[in-house]
From Swiss-Prot:
The active site is a redox-active disulfide bond. It comes from Pseudomonas putida (Arthrobacter siderocapsulatus). Disulfide bonds join C49-C54. FAD binds at residues 34-49, 58, 122, 319, 327. Coiled coil: none annotated. The branched-chain alpha-keto dehydrogenase complex catalyzes the overall conversion of alpha-keto acids to acyl-CoA and CO(2). It contains multiple copies of 3 enzymatic components: branched-chain alpha-keto acid decarboxylase (E1), lipoamide acyltransferase (E2) and lipoamide dehydrogenase (E3). Also acts in the glycine cleavage system. Its EC number is 1.8.1.4. This is Dihydrolipoyl dehydrogenase. The keyword Flavoprotein applies.
Length: 478
């Protein structure tokens, strides 16, 4: 007998599993299809984010930073450690334990909320039917009133550097190194490349980042990207801009990479090479020819502002649709879609989705950059506050970076918050909340912030917008 559901979700990443749980909470009979399995062959929920993305990379970032601090900075606090060593296998094992715990947690949440997990590859057929292909090749077809496509993305492959997951690896392979490579190359100076490059640089690798663009972190505010490049270079990342990789040759346990820059053709040899040039949507074999769902030339599914496809009752969320490939975007899209299935008037504010790079210092922003606003002809006032003037940052021996608040010169409404420094990912969320409610810089300046805290830097930057900062000299006079 054919199984029937109110909602069938294809993909159990941060978009899919959140949508499935929310649907079940709202009383909808829900199933979630996922093909990903762990090393033991068991169903692994959570998608790229939990298994080989957001979570494991943060585990390695935190472990590597603690190692670097113990080796270089504990003496500032009066702590003598002797020789500091890193057990890479133990570090990677800790990461794996965290992943197992969290993916198991999603399974527990499915059970608690009554979501049916189905292991296999999901494919949308005509009439909102979904074909599930099991690992043994058998298939079954289930029916749904509503289908949510949340199949995620995978690393982009480039012909000049074919991944073998041995010497040349993608972001997944870079999480599994069992030893620190002496010479590490990274193709791509984006979020993934900088984070993974930072991990292994802290542990002693000589890291070279090859970026085809001439501009570093183009999406970030110019002041932030300049500070980030300076700081990361000081930490040991050799960032080569305008370096377009044209070829690679693996020789045993090393790889010779050929790239071109302003000086012509160059060659450089690495022990490991990480290809981190972005991700592409996973829509291959997701849709039957008669499904009715439309995709573009790059594999993205066409949707409207509410993630509805061209087929009534079929939706797509997360990395398979246009926009930033962010876990939190996918999750909120999933919730919005389910709310709308239930008849609620839910929507998302795509202008206020925070972006974060988990290097050290962290880099985070929400809203528009100063250069973008100037290009639009918007007059702005800007306030900045350096963490070097923060008592809490000094106490933590973590004073690099600053907070920057941008406000409309006419209305004082906050249009952008940009942070590079300690806990930037947490601080920028305060800016997102303020901007969601149309807060002015003056409003932020009138709020009482706990002392001593890092968040006071946001307070002071907001005050500085109108020349009222207390703990730093004001560029703008009141």
């Amino acid at each position: 007998m054919t199984q029937k559901f109110d909602v069938v979700v294809i993909g159990a990443g941060p978009g899919g599993y959140v949508a499935a749980i929310k649907a079940a909470q709202l009383g909808l009979k829900t199933a979630c299809i996922e093909k990903y399995t762990d090393a033991e062959g068991k169903l692994a929920l959570g998608g790229t984010c939990l298994n080989v993305g957001c979570i494991p990379s943060k585990a390695l970032l935190d472990s590597s930073w603690k190692y670097k601090e113990a080796k270089e900075s504990f003496n500032v606090h009066g702590i003598s450690t002797g020789e500091v060593k890193m057990d890479v296998a133990a570090m990677v094992g800790r990461k794996a334990g965290i992943v197992k715990n969290l993916t198991g947690g999603v399974a527990t949440l499915f059970k608690a909320n009554g979501v049916t997990s189905i292991q296999g590859h999901g494919k949308l057929l005509a009439g909102k039917k979904v074909e599930v292909t099991k690992a043994d090749g058998t298939t079954e077809v289930i029916e749904a009133e509503n289908v949510i496509l949340a199949s995620g993305s995978r690393p982009i492959d480039i012909p000049p550097a074919p991944v073998d997951q041995n010497v040349i690896v993608d972001s997944t392979g870079a999480l599994e190194f069992q030893a620190v490579p002496k010479r590490l190359g990274v193709i791509g100076a984006g979020v993934i490349g900088l984070e993974l490059g930072s991990v292994w640089a802290r542990l002693g690798a000589e890291v070279t980042v090859l970026e085809a663009l001439d501009t570093f972190l183009m999406a970030a505010d110019t002041a932030v990207s300049k500070e980030a490049q300076k700081t990361l270079t000081k930490q040991g990342l050799d960032i080569k801009l305008g370096a377009r990789v044209t070829g690679s040759k693996v020789n045993g346990n090393e790889v010779e990479v050929t790239y071109t820059n302003a000086e012509g053709e160059q060659k450089i040899t690495f022990d490991k090479l990480i290809v981190a040039v972005g991700r592409r949507p996973v829509t291959t074999d997701l849709l039957a020819a008669d499904s009715g769902v439309t995709i573009d030339e790059r594999g993205y599914i066409f949707v409207d502002d509410y993630c509805a496809t061209s087929v009534p009752g079929v939706y797509a969320i997360g990395d398979v649709v246009r926009g930033m490939m962010l876990a939190h975007k996918a999750s909120e899209e999933g919730i919005m879609v389910v709310e709308r299935i239930k008849g609620h008037k839910a929507q998302m504010n795509y202008d206020l989705i925070p972006s974060v790079i988990y290097t050290h210092p962290e880099i985070a922003w929400v809203g528009k950059t100063e250069q973008a606003l100037k290009a639009e002809g918007v007059e702005v006032n800007v306030g900045t506050f350096p963490f070097a003037a923060s008592g809490r940052a000094m106490a933590a021996n973590d004073t690099g970076g600053f907070v920057k608040v941008i406000a409309d010169a006419k209305t004082d409404r906050v249009l952008g918050v940009h942070v590079i420094g300690p806990s930037a990912a947490e601080l920028v969320q305060q800016g997102a909340i303020a901007m969601e409610f149309g807060t002015s810089a003056e409003d932020l300046g009138m709020m009482v912030f706990s002392h001593p805290t890092l968040s006071e830097a946001l307070h002071e930057a907001a005050l500085a917008v109108n020349g009222g900062a207390i703990h730093v000299a004001n560029r703008k006079k009141r």
